[in-house]
Each structure stands twice: as structure tokens, then as C-alpha cells.
UniProtKB/Swiss-Prot annotation:
Null allele phenotype: Strong variations in phenotypes, probably depending on the distinct targeting strategies, genetic background and experimental conditions used in the different experiments. According to PubMed:18063692, mice are viable and fertile and do not display any gross physical, immunological, reproductive and neurological abnormalities, but show 17-beta-estradiol (E2)-induced alleviated thymic atrophy. According to PubMed:20734455, male mice display increased body size, femur length, bone mass and cell proliferative activity within the growth plate.
Glycan attachment sites: N32, N44
Transmembrane segments: 63-84, 97-120, 133-153, 176-194, 221-236, 260-280, 307-327
A GO MF term: steroid binding
Compartments (UniProt record): Nucleus; Cytoplasm; Cytoplasm, Perinuclear region; Cytoplasm, Cytoskeleton
The protein's name: G-protein coupled estrogen receptor 1
Assembly information from the UniProt record: Interacts with RAMP3; the interaction confers proper subcellular localization and function in cardioprotection. Interacts with KRT7 and KRT8. Interacts with EGFR; the interaction increases after agonist-induced stimulation in cancer-associated fibroblasts (CAF). Interacts with EGFR and ESR1. Interacts (via C-terminus tail motif) with DLG4 (via N-terminus tandem pair of PDZ domains); the interaction is direct and induces the increase of GPER1 protein levels residing at the plasma membrane surface in a estradiol-independent manner. Homodimer.
Post-translational modifications: Ubiquitinated; ubiquitination occurs at the plasma membrane and leads to proteasome-mediated degradation.
The species this protein was found in: Mus musculus (Mouse)
């Protein structure tokens, strides 16, 4: 395609990419990222796909997500909530944080069925519905990343400042922290919404998710800053671990809690990185003069790419229960006891016990003993 001609459209309604070349005031970084993301750029696989082919690929990926990941996320997060609440008297501080994280994940997983089959991006053309869905998703996205950030900081206090901060690391303060995190998540969403809504009330196709200031805030407050804090916490934790091994060693319980939280943070980073890179590339592109707000939406500009990064982000909420089940020793013990209590028939009890023992190989006799060593 000649560099002086505008990007071609594929199909009837889907706009595949911005006009190229970009305006003269664009930065080299924005130009390179724009070309890299273009769905009709050389080397980009989606550039040669028709509208129907992109729809089929998106539908196939949505079906894979619904068949394999959605049941794990939906049932797994419910189990985390039900089992831990059933044994609330034996709940540790990390368990309390994971319960709140599971609540946020469960809401995201339930909402994901609407998102993953929104293949034509139709509800993004309805201003009220688009704004409502965006508010709903952002609150739970912020709560997830805020809980992960606070859990990393809590691990640092438990390992490096145990003597100094022991009086403050109580269940009462943990519950108070959870309430403040939920309030911060709601505020981080509603305050910008109120501000931008007053400026865009006259726009027929206004959607909260498409406002550039909101997108910058989402990338900065929901990804860059939290992971900078998490990285700092884990660097300090590593230093504390090295010192602990030199002197007296580290309690196995705390090692396992640290390993589980690190795994959750790593999976969150991998799943949400594509979404934030996608939004950042869109933000670095200069708005074309005369473009309507609807056409500026990156969801309309790159439908297949946007659908893929959405699926990756939702996958995080489905994978957390797996991490919690396989790395959370206390939860495995609680799950065994919960199943044994709820299965009254002897044959069914033996079957469930054997199944759990095969899936989670660990001796059940040690379950009650391990409950006593709370973090």
C-alpha cells in the first residue's frame, strides 16, 4: 500500500486502522507503535483477514474461554468464598485478603460472559450501556490490583518488620484495610467519571471507557504504579529472606504464603500486560482531525486485537483459584474437611475423599494440625 494513501476499510462497518502517515506532529515512538499495531500493516496477521474471518476467530476464542476457563473461575472463586467463610474462625490474614480478591474475581468472571460474546462490539455504540459496563469493570479491576499491591506490602511487613509491625497486623486491621481498598476502588472510578461526564454530556456517543484521560488513569493507577510498588516490596522481601536464611531460617508457612502471593502477582502481570500495552499504544497515537469520538475508540479500530487482550485479562480471574488451590496448603485442608462435612453418605464421602486425595496429594490427618499455625 502506498504510504500516501489512507488505510483501507474491510467489510462494511469495521474501521481497521488510523490514517497513515500520521500527522507531522506525531512522535517517532507513536508512529512505530501505530504501524506495529495496525491490523493492515505488513507482517500483522490480522491485516489479511476479512471481517467474517475475524468474527470466526473471535467466536472460537470465546468458546474456548467459556468451555475451559469460565467454569474454573466461576466455581473456583465460589469455593474459595464458601469454604473460607465456613471456617472463618481459622481464617488467617492472607486468607482474608484472598477472600476479597476472590469476590472481585467472581464479579469479573460473571461479567466476562457478556464481554467475550460481544463480538461485534455492539454495546459500545450504546452510550449508557458502554459507560455502565466500563464502570463495573474498572471498579473490580482496581480492587484486584489494589488487593494484590496491599498483599505484597503485607508480606513485606510480615517477613521484614515482624517484630515492629506485629501489633498492627491483626484481623481487625486487615478487615479495615479491605474496606478502605474497596472504597479506593470505587473512588478511583466514580470521581473521574463524574468529572468527565460533565464535559461530555452533549456527545451522543460518549462512553466513559473511551475518554483519553480515563485511559491514562487506568494504565497509570491500575498497572504502572501498583507494579512499581509490588516490585519494590518483593525486592525488599528478597533482601529480608537472604538475611533470615543467614541467621535463623524462615518459617515454612511464611515461605508458602509468599510463594502463593508471588504466583498470583505474576499471573496478574502476564494477563493484564497485553490490555495495558494495547491501551497505551492507542493513547500514543495522535487523534485525527475531524474524527468523531466513536471512530476514535480503539475497540472499533482494532476489534480482533481488542477482543484477544480482553480474553487475556479475564483469564486472570479464572486462574487465581487454581493458584490458591494448588499453592494454598491451608485452603486444601479446609476444602477436604468441608467436603467431608457436607457429604453425609459414607460411599459418597469415600469417593470425594479419594478424589481430593488424588487431585491434591497430601495427608488429611495433618489438616487440623496445620490450622493452628496461622500467618
Amino acid at each position: 500500500m502506498d504510504a500516501t494513501t489512507p488505510a483501507q476499510t474491510v467489510g462494511v462497518e469495521i474501521y481497521l486502522g488510523p490514517v497513515w502517515p500520521a500527522p507531522s506532529n506525531s512522535t517517532p515512538l507513536a508512529l512505530n507503535l501505530s504501524l506495529a499495531l495496525r491490523e493492515d500493516a505488513p507482517g500483522n496477521l490480522t491485516g489479511d483477514l476479512s471481517e467474517h474471518q475475524q468474527y470466526v476467530i473471535a467466536l472460537f476464542l470465546s468458546c474456548l474461554y467459556t468451555i475451559f476457563l469460565f467454569p474454573i473461575g466461576f466455581v473456583g472463586n465460589i469455593l474459595i468464598l464458601v469454604v473460607n467463610i465456613s471456617f472463618r474462625e481459622k481464617m488467617t490474614i492472607p486468607d482474608l485478603y484472598f477472600i476479597n480478591l476472590a469476590a472481585a474475581d467472581l464479579i469479573l468472571v460473571a461479567d466476562s460472559l457478556i464481554e467475550v460474546f460481544n463480538l461485534d462490539e455492539q454495546y459500545y455504540d450504546i452510550a449508557v450501556l458502554c459507560t455502565f459496563m466500563s464502570l463495573f469493570l474498572q471498579i473490580n479491576m482496581y480492587s484486584s490490583v489494589f488487593f494484590l499491591t496491599w498483599m505484597s506490602f503485607d508480606r513485606y511487613l510480615a517477613l521484614a518488620k515482624a517484630m515492629r509491625c506485629g501489633l498492627f497486623r491483626t484481623k481487625h486491621h486487615a478487615r479495615l484495610s479491605c474496606g478502605l481498598i474497596w472504597m479506593a476502588s470505587v473512588s478511583a472510578t466514580l470521581v473521574p467519571f463524574t468529572a468527565v461526564h460533565l464535559r461530555h454530556t452533549e456527545e451522543a456517543c460518549f462512553c466513559f471507557a473511551d475518554v483519553r484521560e480515563v485511559q491514562w488513569l487506568e494504565v497509570t493507577l491500575g498497572f504502572i504504579m501498583p507494579f512499581a510498588i509490588i516490585g519494590l516490596c518483593y525486592s525488599l522481601i528478597v533482601r529480608a529472606l537472604i538475611r533470615a536464611h543467614r541467621h535463623r531460617g524462615l518459617r515454612p508457612r511464611r515461605q508458602k504464603a509468599l510463594r502463593m502471593i508471588f504466583a498470583v502477582v505474576l499471573v496478574f502481570f502476564i494477563c493484564w500486560l497485553p490490555e495495558n500495552v494495547f491501551i497505551s499504544v492507542h493513547l500514543l497515537q495522535w487523534t485525527q482531525p475531524g474524527d468523531t469520538p466513536c471512530k476514535q475508540s480503539f475497540r472499533h479500530a482494532y476489534p480482533l486485537t481488542g477482543h484477544i487482550v480482553n480474553l487475556a485479562a479475564f483469564s486472570n480471574s479464572c486462574l487465581n483459584p487454581l493458584i490458591y488451590s494448588f499453592l494454598g496448603e491451608t485452603f486444601r485442608d479446609k476444602l477436604r474437611l468441608y467436603v467431608e462435612q457436607k457429604t453425609s453418605l459414607p460411599a459418597l464421602n469415600r469417593f470425594c475423599h479419594a478424589t481430593l486425595k488424588a487431585v491434591i496429594p497430601d495427608s488429611t490427618e495433618q489438616s487440623e494440625v496445620r490450622f493452628s499455625s496461622a500467618v
